């Protein structure tokens, strides 16, 4: 029996390599677990210590803040003078820096002058390009020629003083009402032109001569070049033409467009009486001195006019026709003259009316005096 027990103990002591490694692995794992446990305990203790230290520091800071507040209050009450801060003085510049700053404007001016001088020597300083805007009767070549711009002129001269090139255009070309020479980079110049409008045409030999709104005449044009509707002035006196053109510019454009021609009526009583033919077939007689005052009434009267009517504005305003004016006037008899002189006597006036009733039917009555402008306007509105 004793031998059997010794054999069993010997079997227990003999271990394989794998068993030995396993035993070592378990021991190491146990040691690591114990070390991790110790580290956790140490970390917990450290955290507690840090928290306690932080609480203590906050308490100390609160105490120090209270002390500083109390000290500030005490300092305000005692009104102790504050310490002045030291002002930093700028560093002194050297003599060379001061001299450079003083000479810098002179250097820049000299460089600019040198650059301009070099540019003026080059051919680019005289190269110019032109264009025109707003023209209908003039072209670019005429404007350049009238402005007296030379190929040798510097474009800087045009930029600095454009007026000396604009004034000759206004004196030379009658079409131009205003002109402005504007500059565009790098060397382009634009003629901004405003032209006079054509108010009427004067009939001359082999054509028609346009009359501008300033009263000046320009080169004649052919009949094929005329617009569909235009106004013809058949007046010879240039002063009267210029005055009439100025008057027409003040009238409504719709009324002026309806005028076909204007000529002198050759009246013995009114020297400046004008005969105005309208495109609608009517004729207006009006003194030139009263044109702007009376002619606008035609716009209201024409609504009630028959075709080919005559509106006489020489004395007052009344309407008639050519047929009525062509009728011969019957001279008054001596009895009618006597009745006119003794119109205050009722008996004789009644006798004269009886005699008038016996006159032949083919005799026309004397011409009536024209009504006033107010009466005609009331009839037109009615």
UniProtKB/Swiss-Prot annotation:
Entry's transmembrane regions: 104-124
Keywords from UniProt, A to Z, are: Cell cycle, Cell division, Cell membrane, Membrane, Transmembrane, Transmembrane helix
Q: Which GO terms describe its cellular component?
A: cell division site; plasma membrane
Q: How does it sit in the membrane?
A: Single-pass type II membrane protein
> Major place of localization?
membrane
- Per the record, what ranges lie on the membrane's Extracellular side? 125-382
Location of the region described as Disordered in the Swiss-Prot/TrEMBL record: 36-92, 322-382
Q: List all topological domains (Cytoplasmic).
A: 1-103
Q: Name one Pfam family in it.
A: POTRA_1
Q: Where in the cell is it found?
A: Cell membrane
Biological process (GO), any one = FtsZ-dependent cytokinesis
Point to the regions of Basic and acidic residues compositional bias: 36-49, 60-70, 338-352
Q: Which residues form the POTRA domain?
A: 125-196
Give the UniProt family note.
Answer: Belongs to the FtsQ/DivIB family. DivIB subfamily.
This chain's function reads: Cell division protein that may be involved in stabilizing or promoting the assembly of the division complex.
This protein's name: Cell division protein DivIB
Query: What species is this protein from?
Result: Streptococcus pyogenes serotype M2 (strain MGAS10270)
The gene name on file is divIB
């Amino acid at each position: 029996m004793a031998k059997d027990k010794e054999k069993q103990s010997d079997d227990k002591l003999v271990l394989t390599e794998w068993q030995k490694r396993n035993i070592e692995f378990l021991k190491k794992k146990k040691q690591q677990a114990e070390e991790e446990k110790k580290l956790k305990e140490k970390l917990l203790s450290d955290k507690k210590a840090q928290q306690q230290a932080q609480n203590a520091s906050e308490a100390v800071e609160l105490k120090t803040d209270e002390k500083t507040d109390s000290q500030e209050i005490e300092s305000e009450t005692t009104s102790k003078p504050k310490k002045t801060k030291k002002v930093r003085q700028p560093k002194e510049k050297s003599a060379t820096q001061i001299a450079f700053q003083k000479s810098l404007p002179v250097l820049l001016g000299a460089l600019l002058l040198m650059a301009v001088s070099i540019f003026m020597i080059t051919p680019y300083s005289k190269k110019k390009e032109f264009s025109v805007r707003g023209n209908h009767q003039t072209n670019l070549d005429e404007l350049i020629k009238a402005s007296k711009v030379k190929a040798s002129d510097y474009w800087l001269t045009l930029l600095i003083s454009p007026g000396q090139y604009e004034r000759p255009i206004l004196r030379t070309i009658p079409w131009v009402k205003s002109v402005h020479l504007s500059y565009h980079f790098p060397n382009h110049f634009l003629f901004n032109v405003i032209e006079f409008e054509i108010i009427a045409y004067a009939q001359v030999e082999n054509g028609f001569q346009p009359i501008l709104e300033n009263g000046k005449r320009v080169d004649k044009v052919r009949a094929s070049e005329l617009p569909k509707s235009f106004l013809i002035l058949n007046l010879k006196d240039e002063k009267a033409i210029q005055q009439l053109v100025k008057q027409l510019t003040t009238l409504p454009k719709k009324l002026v467009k309806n005028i076909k021609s204007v000529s002198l009526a050759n009246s013995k009583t009114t020297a400046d009486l004008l005969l105005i033919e309208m495109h609608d077939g009517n004729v207006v007689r009006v003194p030139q001195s009263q044109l702007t005052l009376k002619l606008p009434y035609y716009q209201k009267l024409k609504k009630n006019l028959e075709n080919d009517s005559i509106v006489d504005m020489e004395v007052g305003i009344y309407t008639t026709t050519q047929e009525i004016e062509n009728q011969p006037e019957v001279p008054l008899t001596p009895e009618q003259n006597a009745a006119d002189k003794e119109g205050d006597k009722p008996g004789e006036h009644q006798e004269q009316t009886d005699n008038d009733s016996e006159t032949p039917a083919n005799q026309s009555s004397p011409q009536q005096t024209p009504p006033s402008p107010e009466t005609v306007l009331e009839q037109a509105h009615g």
